[in-house]
A protein has these predicted regions:
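Beta->alpha loop/short-helix hinge microenvironment recognizer with preference
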Residues: 1-433
């Protein structure tokens, strides 16, 4: 299973020699000035511009530049060449993040139990609480584990009630649901609004016997109150809020924090994977940018402002902000290096460990030494209905060689002498008779 567009009318595949986008142009045109003014304008608001974040920007600026090295696909029959520049793997690069997301989605079917029903839950916190976390530079990533614990606890509680007459002993050590959860630190308009997206099984499974207890109904109101109580208890323990502040918050929100539930259709698998894509996707996309005014130093982007509850119809708004403010927010919301933002709990924690072990073993096999290239090829095939590793003229599979930075420029200059760059490919020049 993989993530791709549901649009059946796929565009033609035209390879790009070097990667460019409006988003990347913002960083290319304004990065140096942004670094100069950052401390004065944003240090007190967004914190230090760390070396790790600077490194992510520098990787983004070099993304798709053939001089940093590339993969070369050559057709032995037609002498057609395709150049695929190395990706930067920066967490700030929206293009590379989409590639990473596709690679993740390819393995989803090995992780999720497709025989079980699932539900998508969004755990939110009030604006007043968000402001406290923002002002105190709190580690909001802890919310992921807190939400997953609430989900497990409430399912176990309800299962004990439902199966009480059947005299089944249900302990939270022996019975587990499965869930995938992540943190979105901001709202759609790039405002600080930390919330958790979780996809969980509507069942609990015994760790040893693998017996399944299905839970068709969940006590939604209990979740809201349990989420608030567990959240406050955790951040009180972490000394982010005092006991007095915790009591004030709980008295103010007597019904708990809002928790939104969206059942995932059980008769089809695609909605489950689309929902999983949503929770794993980044907080911003290239397609949102409507306009960049370098003169005024402004960016206009479109964001989803509302979703009609019954029809699921989406409403959108445009927002124009200072380009430096945009850059500061993108860096502020960037996850810390090596921090796992998609986390697996319960039965899925075990399945992901098994999957990682198999991938690690495959990576050391001679026939699977180019797993990342195959991920790229699969992504192109599913997005454009084209096989990028095949020659566009004779359709035969092209030969792959890797060209590193020290010889990249010389290789390209040699190609330009004998070939013409046309529609994404280097084709042999027509010789005079």
């Amino acid at each position: 299973m993989y993530i791709c567009s549901t649009d059946k009318h796929k565009p033609a595949y035209i390879p790009a020699f070097e990667r460019w986008s409006l988003y990347k142009s913002i960083w290319m045109n304004h990065w140096e000035e942004f670094r100069k003014i950052y401390d004065r304008r944003f240090l007190s608001k967004y914190g230090e511009l760390s070396e790790a974040k600077i490194e992510e920007v520098e990787k983004l600026l070099g993304c798709g530049n053939f001089q940093n090295g590339f993969q070369r696909y050559s057709c032995e029959e037609c002498d057609v060449n395709l150049i695929v520049p190395f990706s930067c793997k920066s967490r700030l690069c929206l293009s590379c993040y989409r590639k990473k997301l596709f690679g993740w989605s390819v393995n989803l079917s090995h992780i999720l139990n497709l025989d079980l029903r699932h539900i998508h839950i969004t755990f939110t916190i009030p604006g007043t609480v968000s402001n406290i976390l923002f002002q105190r530079r709190c580690e909001v990533e802890d919310m992921i584990t807190v939400a997953a614990e609430v989900y497990k606890k409430e399912l176990i509680k309800f299962a004990r009630l439902k199966f009480k007459k059947e005299e089944i002993t249900i302990s939270d050590k022996d019975w587990l649901p499965g869930s995938i959860a992540t943190l979105h630190k901001c709202g759609n308009s790039l405002n600080f609004n930390p919330h958790i997206h979780l996809v969980g099984t509507r069942a609990i499974i015994h760790k040893e016997t693998k017996e399944v207890l299905h839970l068709s109904f969940l006590r939604y109101k209990k979740f809201a109150f349990s989420w608030m109580k567990t959240f406050c208890k955790h951040y009180e323990k972490e000394k982010v809020i005092s006991n007095a502040e915790s009591l004030v918050i709980q008295n103010k929100y007597k019904n708990g924090f809002h928790v939104y539930f969206q059942p995932i259709a059980s008769e089809e698998k695609e909605p489950l994977f689309r929902t999983s894509e949503y929770i794993a996707s980044g907080f911003f996309h290239n397609s949102q940018i409507q306009k960049v005014d370098d003169g005024k130093k402004e960016i206009t982007f479109r964001y989803k402002s509302w979703v009609e509850k019954d029809t699921r119809e989406k409403s959108f708004q445009d927002q124009t902000i200072d380009v430096y403010e945009f850059m500061a927010r993108m860096l502020f919301f960037l996850p810390d290096p090596n921090r796992k933002m998609i986390r697996y709990y319960g039965i899925y924690a075990n399945r992901i460990m098994v999957r990682h072990a198999s991938l690690e073993a495959a990576a050391h096999q001679p026939d699977n030494s180019i797993l990342s290239q195959r991920t790229w090829a699969q992504a192109i095939e599913n997005s454009f209905d084209a096989k990028p590793e095949n020659c566009p003229d004779c359709a035969k599979r092209m030969q792959l060689t890797v060209v590193y930075s020290y010889s990249a420029r010389k290789t390209i200059e040699g190609l330009k002498e004998t070939h013409t760059y046309l529609k994404g490919y280097f084709r042999p020049k027509v010789r005079s008779p």
